[in-house]
């Protein structure tokens, strides 16, 4: 398949990308990968058993952002997590409680530099993060823009 000119050209073009807008996928039976048939429930179970929490461009990763290689890896056509992590700017789009693990893993892995999300997801991501690092610390979920007395 990699000998196909159009695929070869797409991969060559990917080498010149300096900004990527990507989605982060969660690994649940309700995920679009499973619903659309790109991933079977058996493959999903294999990934989860290996510690995978999310995916970007069909590249799977664990809670630390480390790649998780599945038995079907060689049948996936993707630029891969290694290449994604070398891109100068990767902005991820992900929101909702089901995506928290995928977002945290991507942030820990350092392969995204920006995140587009909703307020509730952002606040949940900041729970437990010390306030000196921009989090809410142990003060609970404050509304964005409200000052906290204490």
Which residue ranges define each predicted feature?
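Conserved phosphate- and dinucleotide-binding cores of soluble alpha/beta proteins
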Residues: 1-137, 141, 150
């Amino acid at each position: 398949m990699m000998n196909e000119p159009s695929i070869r050209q797409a991969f060559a073009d990917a080498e010149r990308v300096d900004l990527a807008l990507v989605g982060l996928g969660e690994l649940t039976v309700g995920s679009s990968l499973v619903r659309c048939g790109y991933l079977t429930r058996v493959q999903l179970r294999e990934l989860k058993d290996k510690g995978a929490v999310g995916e970007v461009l069909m590249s799977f990763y664990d809670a630390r952002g480390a790649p998780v290689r599945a038995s079907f890896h060689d049948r996936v056509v993707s630029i891969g997590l290694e290449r994604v992590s070398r891109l100068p700017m990767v902005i991820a789009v992900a929101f909702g409680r089901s995506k928290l693990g995928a977002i945290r893993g991507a942030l820990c892995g350092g392969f995204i530099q920006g995140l587009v999300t909703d307020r509730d997801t952002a606040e949940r991501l900041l729970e437990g993060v010390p306030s000196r690092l921009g989090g809410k610390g142990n003060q609970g979920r404050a509304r964005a823009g409200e000052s906290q007395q204490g």
